[in-house]
């Protein structure tokens, strides 16, 4: 009995014709982020001109942990420079902030800009890595494909990793203060998402360090502030995009601060989402930092 090969050959030819298109789609990944006019994104993987990725030995585990540094060309020898410590969101990198518009504004304003990894890029800077959402709050969606783990891997205990995450930030701060002539009255802290929650924690725990703190789309689930909270002594900026599912919890946090008459600014950026707020809010962040110098005695 003779079998026709025409259908199978047609199927094979069709598959071969489709393969390039399938490969192209697979390589495209997520669509590019769309920023407002005048905002530049940049890479979270490859450092741009003027940005260094450095490493140091983290004593508790002996691992080499990364941090990123940008130094404005406006800084002169012997001149005290303002410093910004930047904390990435969940699965981000040390370049989450140290790129694009943030670098442009740091250059223009004469800042040193430093991105810490927080032991690794899934740890919470002293806060549990995956906070439990408050009632009625929707956390941002998890990425479909988890980005690679960056940073320390030797420690596996969640509580220890959380403590190491905080310790890494403070280690990096200490290293930078020793290397550069830092203006102690102009040390600022900024964080996004998980890093925003971490920035709130570090501001609360070390209030005498920071001249101001900026929380961009921060993970603030179940956070309560009282009149005795140390963070009430620090000028604070809250920024969120109107397309971000976290906007409700951040509004609630701002309302807590209003009730306590805490000095802070709350900005909702039109058209921005959980990711684009990072670069999209930087002009407001730098204007906010420029207005705040830590008092001699707080």
Predicted regions located by residue number:
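Cell-envelope and extracellular/periplasmic
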Residues: 88-90, 177-180, 192, 199, ...
């Amino acid at each position: 009995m003779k079998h026709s090969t025409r259908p199978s050959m047609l199927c094979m030819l069709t598959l071969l014709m489709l393969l390039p298109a399938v490969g192209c789609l697979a390589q495209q990944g997520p669509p590019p982020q769309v920023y407002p006019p005048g905002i530049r994104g940049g890479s979270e993987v490859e450092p741009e001109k003027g940005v260094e990725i450095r490493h140091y030995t983290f004593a508790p585990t002996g691992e080499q942990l990364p941090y990123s540094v940008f130094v404005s060309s406006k800084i002169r020898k012997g001149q005290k420079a303002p410093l910004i410590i930047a904390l990435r969101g969940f699965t981000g990198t040390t370049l989450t902030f140290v790129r694009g518009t943030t670098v442009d504004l740091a250059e223009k304003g004469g800042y040193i800009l430093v991105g810490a990894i927080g032991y690794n890029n899934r740890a919470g800077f002293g806060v549990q890595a995956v906070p439990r959402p408050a009632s009625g709050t929707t956390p941002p969606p998890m990425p479909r494909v988890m980005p690679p783990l960056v940073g320390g891997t030797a420690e596996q205990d969640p509580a220890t990793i959380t403590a190491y995450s905080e310790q890494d930030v403070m280690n990096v701060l200490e290293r930078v203060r020793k290397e550069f002539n830092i203006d102690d009255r102009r040390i600022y802290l900024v964080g996004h998402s998980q890093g925003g929650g971490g920035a709130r924690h570090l501001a609360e725990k070390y209030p005498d360090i920071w001249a101001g703190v900026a929380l961009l789309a921060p993970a603030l689930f179940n956070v309560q502030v009282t009149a005795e909270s140390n963070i009430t002594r620090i000028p604070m900026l809250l920024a969120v995009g109107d397309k971000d599912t976290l906007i409700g919890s951040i509004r609630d946090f701002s309302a807590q601060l209003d009730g306590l008459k805490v000095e802070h600014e709350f900005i909702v950026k039109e058209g921005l989402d959980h990711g684009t707020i990072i670069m999209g809010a930087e002009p407001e962040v730098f204007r906010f930092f420029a207005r705040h110098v830590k008092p001699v005695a707080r």
